[in-house]
Amino acid sequence: MSDLRTAIERATPRRKRWPWVAAAVAVLLVAGGGFALTRGDASTGRSATAGAPVRGGTLQFALIDYQRSPDPQWGTNYAESLIGNNITDKLTWQDPDTGEITPWLAESWEYNKDLTEFTFHLRKDVTFSDGSPFDSEVVKANFDQYVHGDEKLGINPNGAILLPGYIETLTPDRYTAVVRFEKPLASFLQASSFTANAQPGFLSLSTLKLSAEERTDPKKVIGTGPFVYESWQPQVKTVLVRRKGYNWAPPALKHKGEAYLDRIVFNTIPEASVRTGSLTSGAIDATLDVGTTDEKPLADQGFKIIYRGVSGTSIFFNLNSQLFPTDDIAVRRAIQLGWNREAVRKTVLTDSYSVATSVLAPSVPGYVDYSGTVLRYDPEKAGRLLDEAGWKEGPDGIRVKDGKKLVVKLLGISNLVANKPAYESIQQDLKKIGIDLRLTVVPIPDYTALLTKAKTDWNIVAANRSRNDPAVLNLQYGPALGNGSYVTKDSPGIDVDEVTRTLGALELTLDPATRKQYAKAAQDLLLDKYALVNPVYNPSQVIAHADYVHGIIFDAQSRNHFVDTWKSNGK
């Protein structure tokens, strides 16, 4: 066992030592009331800095989860997208405050009026860490494989949902790439900056020729980013080292040259108390996934708490429109109205989080607040709706209709620290109006396995989707895309063509005013007309770090970048 692992275990002598080869499982704790913390500058998407940056040193950083593959285009969790963002770059950078798309590997771009053709003019000084050039042929090869996959190599079409209707990438010259779609895709510019799961980070031509199995060797996964892989130990740690010669960070970051840190060690530490103990003992320098009950104690001890709300959707309940009893709109509306959001805010969430007031996060353009209407707490109306729909109270308080109990089965992930306590609070409230909400909240690998039967086994799939664009609603709920509520022509009382048309309109224009109207129509349809989703809370990525750590960046998807990170002691 490494010296760091030994130090981590010593930091928590009263707890059973964690088997480091076990799957990542979060300890989920109910938090106390809200409080104010001394924080970094979350509004600008980076931690506070002090003085001139110091070069050198190793950042020991803890995560609840681990990389299942070094391939960033495959990633399915936060750990994978975070690490992928630091070995690869994107065509564009999205400003985390304004949402503006700004240059990165592409210096400029233009698009046709139909939003089916996007032309990018590339930087000419970018190289991969193996010395090979970044050019239009690389862009073409990446997008082709990202969208279509490669069956012979075992590569999945990871970008097929993000880039629907992709036709091809043309290469009129070495540094011009023209990306074409069969229908309008207004959200593509934002997608070109996308940094969350299954991201379009550029890989070298040599990497693209490798099979999925061969890509488990991190040394063979080559990007253009500010760091390169040194090693990868699944469920234990991933180590990155500084890329020599890097000099093309997004201009918006105003960072020149190479990263400051020599090395980053991403340590998988599933248990919240062990992450906290490791930080307070000095075994690590920073940790993501701070437990809700740990924020205030860490702040009181002088650690900096920085956070950013996740742009995209809230943590939501997808309500299955095909499966009894959520095929009944009265049940779906009762679930929306039947739980106390203020109680969740007070007993579960900290100031780093907020109760959801729409399916969209407040940071997404076009967000509308529904807290005074369909997302208010109104158990009396919820009860009346169920009464009118024929749901009668049974002897145990759970409602019954046609001899069947009002049992609603929920599948969710445990890897976000506020999930399970929030769901348990909702469970208690819904029971008061006669709904038996049964929870299955498990780590991501188990969740993914159970998700294969979501349409037939689960009334609710609790999830969220990161993307700072209102088209995330089409991505998540479009019947031909994510179809999170399983809307088909067989869904009772739902016009599937209307759903397709309303959500698809978000891809038709980049005009802000028109897009705002389309976003409202989409939210009205999902939340009010058909009650297909029950938003719960707006998640945040929360980091606690020592006061000698500076310059951790949150991007528009609330993923972290370390090109500008440094340690005062340089160690």
What would you call each of these model-derived segments?
Residues S108-L153, R174-V178, P325-D327:
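Aromatic- and charge-enriched surface segment that lines or borders ligand/interaction sites
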Residues H121, P157-L208, V228-Q233:
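Surface-exposed binding/hinge segments that line
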Residues T195-A259, R263-V265, S273, P379-E380, ...:
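Gly/Pro-rich hinge or "lid" segments in bacterial periplasmic/extracellular proteins
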Residues R215-P218, Y246-P297, E424, D436-R438, ...:
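Ligand-site clamp/hinge motif
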Residues Y146-N156, T169, E230-V241, V265-L323, ...:
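Extracellular/periplasmic solute-recognition and catalytic clefts
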Residues A62-K113, D144, I222:
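N-terminal lobe/hinge region of extracytoplasmic solute-binding protein
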Residues R242, N247-W248, D327-Q428, A521, ...:
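Append "and occasionally in soluble cytosolic enzymes with long acidic Gly/Pro-rich linkers
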Residues S2-D3, L29, Q233-K237, W339-D369, ...:
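Detector for C-terminal structural segments
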